[in-house]
Regions:
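Ser/Thr/Asn(+Pro)-rich, low-complexity disordered segments
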Residues: 110-525
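Positively charged n-region of N-terminal signal peptides that target proteins for export
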Residues: 1-4
Length: 608
């Protein structure tokens, strides 16, 4: 009798728990741009959650109308049916598996308006893209999904971009420093404490390296993914940035610093370079069952550059300095569409390392011999790709000066590394991260494209996480997902364009400074200048002592913090004095003398 009574009580408890009404979503926020509004909220940890509904009203007191037609499984909603100048009010409810609905959340409001400036547009673009890392991530362990679709595994490279985006978000006021620090420490603890070993499953990595994809909840190897040298390195980029950003003395921030150092110092770089002596090539990956046998080396120009710089600069189990020469031995310098540069067709290879490393005023032996820098090399690659899209030799729909951007992305057939010549792999697919990731070195073509994509395409392109991954007008195809490795460079490279804060902090790490020095990078000299202004003609001429046939680059700033490369400021001297005249666009991005102050500097390309 007691057993029967106990079972009855148990059944009643189970039934009561299953029938419990969900709690109202918390920390609901809303923000808006030109003719769009975005709403986000925190994850409901309650049992049997099925999804969410979003409601809108023109009045704080209602009535509220449901916007979504099916339950939302993400923590955000993008409202594209709004008008500028009208305040909109939003509420969110949670729904459980038995279709019970929570009380409505607190009401939030936002007022869409046209962007008053380019900075306002960039703020909106960055915040929306940052939200992918904050709301799509798992707050319990800090992991970030590879893509926004349901069931995605974690991409450890996405985590690296996300750690960097958190610092940017704090600087812009989208989250607090305490919120960001707590999420970062949670993330670092996941990677530090996760089991390392040679098991086929159940480990997060081995020899300090990490698996490319991880289970979002277990933080262990997902499927048959490889131990990835490049994805681990992109993760380390974010970890080393976080180490410098969170430089406080409280317990959380000091733990971030020590854990970040521990994760980096545990990486066995030399183990990932098992080739015969003299080659020093880093392998692309390793598998528990077959080792390195199915993977080639990183050689030649692409996103792998950061692997060698950090590996050479490491203080334990480091790569030999000679490995940099092995890496550069695979470079191909060529000319396409009027620009000469080290080639790599998809633009991501010209962008990823630049998210963290400031290559503007340093050069290695290879680049110094070409009178170039890696920063300028990426600039030329972006310009050449835009020129290719303008020419559109294959006749893809839509290509022009504003619709360009070929890189690794989703496409109508799956996922592919798209690019322009020399190894052209173009099927008409444009990815927003290509232009967004080029902002730091090609703002003169990237910013107009991003604004065009939003202004003329937001009904198909814009979501609660910023731009979708890609589109293909020839196939009438528009992606249904966002990717962490593509949203991240948009946030980061816009920030590097605006203030260079990410690079400035990352470059404070002794590991990268040591790596650059051992790889043979040297600082490029700045030239003493004289200036003569002609305000009536809105021009200004700079002059400096020069060496004939040497090449120089003009940069300018309005605040001595954010420096921009003049698109017309590359000057090759013909005698002992070189000069350059600022006449406004396209020499600079704003008309001269419209600023309160303007500052110039000139540096010399090539071996000092």
């Amino acid at each position: 009798m007691r057993r029967i009574l106990a079972l009855q009580i148990l059944f009643l408890v189970v039934a009561f728990v299953a029938a419990a009404q969900p709690v109202a979503p918390t920390n609901v926020v809303a923000f808006s741009g030109d003719q769009s509004a975005i709403v986000h909220w925190d994850l409901d940890p309650g049992p049997n959650l099925a999804g969410y509904n979003v409601y809108r009203s023109l009045s704080s007191g209602g009535p509220f109308t449901q916007l979504n037609t099916g339950l939302l499984t993400t923590l955000g909603y993008c409202d594209l049916n709004v008008s500028d100048g009208q305040t909109y009010y939003y509420q969110v409810t949670a729904v459980n598996a038995t279709s019970q609905t929570s009380p409505p959340s607190a009401t939030v409001s936002t007022l869409p308006n046209p962007f008053p400036s380019d900075d306002a547009f960039l703020d909106y673009l960055q915040e929306a893209n940052f939200d992918y890392f904050w709301y799509a991530g798992n707050p319990a362990n800090g992991l970030i999904p590879d893509r926004s679709t349901t069931g995605s595994a974690c991409s450890i490279a996405s985590v690296g971009f996300g750690l960097t985006a958190i610092g940017i978000a704090i600087d812009h006021g989208w989250i607090t420093r305490d919120q960001g620090a707590a999420r970062v420490l949670t993330t670092l603890n996941t990677f530090w404490n996760g089991p390392q070993g040679t098991n086929a499953s159940g480990d997060i990595g081995y020899n300090g390296w990490f698996y490319h994809f991880l289970d979002m909840n277990l933080a262990t190897r997902s499927g048959s993914s490889e131990l990835s040298s490049i994805d681990t390195t992109l993760l380390l980029g974010g970890i080393l940035y976080a180490k410098q950003y969170f430089n406080g003395t409280n317990a959380t921030e000091t733990s971030i610093q020590t854990t970040a150092s521990a994760i980096f110092n545990r990486v066995n770089w030399s183990w990932m370079a098992p080739d015969v002596p003299g080659t020093n090539g880093v392998r692309m990956g390793w598998l528990p069952d077959s080792g390195f046998s199915t993977f080639g080396d990183w050689i030649g120009y692409d996103e792998g550059m950061l692997i060698y710089l950090l590996g050479i600069g490491a203080t334990s189990n480091s790569l030999p300095a000679a490995s940099w020469s092995y890496w550069t031995s695979g470079y191909v310098w060529a000319s396409y569409y009027g620009y000469s540069f080290v080639t790599f067709p998809p633009l991501f290879g010209h962008e990823y390392s630049h998210c963290w490393v400031d290559f503007r005023h340093v050069g290695d032996t290879y680049m110094n011999n070409e009178n170039c820098t890696y920063f300028e090399n990426s600039h030329r690659a972006a310009l050449a790709q835009q020129a290719y899209c303008i020419a559109d030799p294959d006749g893809w729909a839509g290509y022009n000066s504003l619709i360009w951007g070929l890189t690794a992305s989703d496409d109508p057939s799956g996922y592919s590394a798209h690019g322009a010549p020399p190894a052209e792999n173009d099927n008409g697919t444009i990815a927003f991260t290509a232009a967004g990731g080029a902002m730091a070195f090609a703002p003169e073509i990237s910013l107009p494209s991003l604004k065009n994509f939003y202004t003329n395409g937001k009904k198909k392109f814009w979501t609660q996480y910023g731009f979708i991954d890609a589109f293909n007008l020839s196939a009438a195809w528009y992606d249904n997902a966002e990717l962490g490795i593509d949203q991240g460079p948009i946030v980061i490279m816009i920030e590097n364009y605006r203030n260079q804060n990410v690079c400035r902090l990352f470059m404070q790490n002794p590991e990268i400074q040591n790596g650059l020095q051992l790889a043979g990078f040297v600082p490029l000299p700045f030239m003493p200048l004289t200036a003569q202004a002609q305000p009536a003609q809105s021009t200004l001429t700079l002059a400096w002592a020069a060496t004939s046939n040497r090449t120089y680059q003009v940069e300018y700033s309005t605040n001595l913090i954010s420096w921009f490369t003049s698109p017309t400021g590359e000057v090759t001297a013909t005698n002992a004095v070189a000069s350059w005249t600022d006449t406004g666009p396209p020499g600079t991005l704003t008309v001269p003398f419209s600023d309160t102050a303007r500052f110039y500097r000139v540096f010399q390309y090539g071996t000092p």
